[in-house]
Curated annotation (Swiss-Prot):
Record's protein name: Tubulin-folding cofactor B
Tissues expressing this chain: Expressed in roots, stems, leaves, flowers and siliques.
Pfam family name, one: CAP_GLY
Keyword Metal-binding: no
InterPro entries associated with the record: CAP-Gly_dom_sf (IPR036859), CAP-Gly_domain (IPR000938), TBCB_Ubl (IPR045172), Ubiquitin-like_dom (IPR000626), Ubiquitin-like_domsf (IPR029071)
Effect of deleting the gene: Embryo lethality.
Source organism of this protein record: Arabidopsis thaliana (Mouse-ear cress)
Lineage per the UniProt record: Eukaryota, Viridiplantae, Streptophyta, Embryophyta, Tracheophyta
CDD domains from the UniProt entry: Ubl_TBCB
Length: 243
């Protein structure tokens, strides 16, 4: 066990798993400098989960699931609490009126929904259904063929495998690993991305088809209009706007 906790030579950062008491589906992995104050850690986490710094409590758990510390002093450096690679940093939102309370950000059944009867919707002239019916009636065959064959093909002209890129939303950075069609995902063109961090959904295989190779949870398939290629180097984990 002690061997797994050793840091890389010349690298004093620590790799922690992040969870949130109110957001059961929230999960992230990030590196922190032990020199960061607890307050600075909270500021980085606030940008990711929405819990304000003043309402955030942090608990540290070891890799066996045992609580080893409560980070109660915002002025102390993270290293004071002796975190090791693989430990878990657990966020607790102390604000009872927070948007994270009660699962509001995850449970869509809690949101009051707008309902309209089928009869009333059919009478509307400004609905998406009417717009789609009009487009199809004008040239149904050509419209369908264009969608299947050429959707966003023009946006792929300057996107090449190996390009560094930034993907929206979230300004996620990575490398282009695939450019082309992906019938299992939908008509038109897609871009396969290997993200620098585990922000993806797969390892390059989607619905039984392998489009490229990459580490688990670092792969993504997105539309070309979400991709900007250029000088987007891998971010320093200790940049101001990053965890």
């Amino acid at each position: 066990m002690a061997t797994s906790r050793l840091q890389l030579e010349g690298d004093d950062s620590v790799h922690l798993h992040i969870t949130h008491a109110n957001l059961k589906s929230f999960s992230a992995d990030a590196r922190f400098s032990p020199q960061m104050s607890v307050e600075a850690v909270k500021e980085k986490l606030w940008k990711k989960c929405g819990t304000s710094v003043n309402s955030m409590a942090l608990e540290l758990y070891d890799d066996s699931g045992s609580k080893v510390a409560v980070l109660s002093d915002d002025s102390r450096p993270l290293g004071f609490f002796s975190p090791f690679d693989g430990f878990r940093l657990h966020i607790i939102d102390l604000d009872p009126s927070s948007v994270t309370t009660g699962g509001w950000l995850e449970d869509t059944s809690l949101v009051e929904k707008y309902n309209i009867s089928e009869e009333d919707y059919a009478k509307r002239t400004d609905s998406f259904r009417k717009f789609k019916e009009k487009r199809v009636s004008q040239n149904p065959v050509a419209a369908e063929a264009k969608t299947k064959e050429n959707y966003m093909e023009d946006l792929c002209a300057n996107i090449k495998v190996g390009d560094r890129c930034q993907v929206e939303p979230g300004e996620k950075r990575g490398m282009v690993k695939y450019v082309g069609r992906a019938e299992s995902l939908g008509p038109g063109y897609w871009v396969g991305i290997q993200y620098d961090e585990p922000l993806g959904k797969h390892d390059g295989m989607v619905k039984g088809t392998r489009f490229f190779e990459c580490p688990r949870l670092q792969g993504g398939m997105v539309r070309p209009d979400k991709v900007k290629v250029g000088d987007y180097p891998e971010r320093d984990p200790f940049e101001e706007d990053e965890i």
